[in-house]
Amino acid sequence: MFEAANRDQSVIVHVGRSGDTRAVQLEPAAMELPDRELASRIVRLNTLAYLRSQLAIRREMEANRVEGIAGRLPTEPQVNAYAATIDF
């Protein structure tokens, strides 16, 4: 499982190895957010968790010397750049 959470851990999203959403955990602080903001945070965190799952697959493929993955799976700098946008 791959996880992404906001700073105060009030919104946590878990995705499986294939990138499928497995769970969304909402703490009381998250329930105080306006609907649009909460939805936006869930989507953005889900995207980050998905990117992390895809990066793990990329690393496995690189370790196994699989060719042709360059443009199909995210790199670590790409995932880190997206993670840096999670400013909440």
What are the residue ranges of the model-derived segments?
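Acidic, negatively charged sequence signal
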Residues: 1-5, 10-15, 23-88
